Amino acid sequence: MKFVIVTGLSGSGKSETMRALEDMGFYCVDNLPPALITKFAELCYQPNSSIDKVALGIDIRGRKFFEALHESLNYLEKENYEYEMVYLDCNDDVLLKRYKMTRRNHPLAKDMQIPEGIKMERKIMEPLKELSTCIIDTTNMKPKDLKEEIKKIYSSGEDNPNLTISVVSFGFKHGILADADLVFDVRFLPNPYYVEELRAKTGDDKEVRDYVMNSKISEEFYVKLLDMIHFLVPQYIEEGKQHLVIGVGCTGGRHRSVTITNLIAEDLSNKGYRVVKKHRDSMLR
């Protein structure tokens, strides 16, 4: 049984996530009162139940029921009903832009400005974020990107189906990766930006990869980095983590971080892990 609870900030993509899960065969129920979660779980976990994948949507409109939600989650754990919680996050500026584009009002902004409603909701939702097994930052995602992310996380068939590892390159000058569990700064590695014939290329190009890795420092760093990742991943699996985000950052996110991200993703894939690779800023200037 796959039992997924979807929550997060209003405007961060919960509806898109629920639609993506529904397309993948999940039985989806949106805005279920938290007090009914336990009854619903009992029905789903009955031996004769034909439901094997469930997604429940919980949002701020049910904020008065948060106490009931915590009671329900405690009950699920007590009864050994396994569940995952996906939390959708997004930065305030993008949330505000999304609300202006759709001309919809924030559910908490009836008597206040939208930015104030977003701030209040973020504070209310923080305890749920801390309980979540998977946090997805949709700041730089379009709906199709989010759908693809959900599809990769909840697809099956790999050797380690309980953990999805996202390896993401980024540029520090464009902002740090907000949802990363691990962040590695590779700005000390040889920089192809200062080589004229390599500047317009990215870490996906062999010439850039060779330039970055053709130094003793790069080789030694990568061996030690990989050794640490190989040590950490089983610990996260043992802890029950569902989604691990590894961020690799350089200055612009085009050369060094892309190179190291590609190497990490390739190595982890070869070891049978489910890996999602993404280059957040490689096309930015």
UniProtKB/Swiss-Prot annotation:
ATP binds at G8, L9, S10, G11, S12, G13, K14, S15. It holds the Pfam family PapZ_C. InterPro entries: P-loop_NTPase, RapZ-like, RapZ-like_N, RapZ_C. One of its GO terms (molecular function) is ATP binding. Keywords: ATP-binding, GTP-binding, Nucleotide-binding. GTP binds at D59, I60, R61, G62. SUPFAM superfamilies: P-loop containing nucleoside triphosphate hydrolases. Displays ATPase and GTPase activities. Belongs to the RapZ-like family. This is Nucleotide-binding protein CD630_34000.
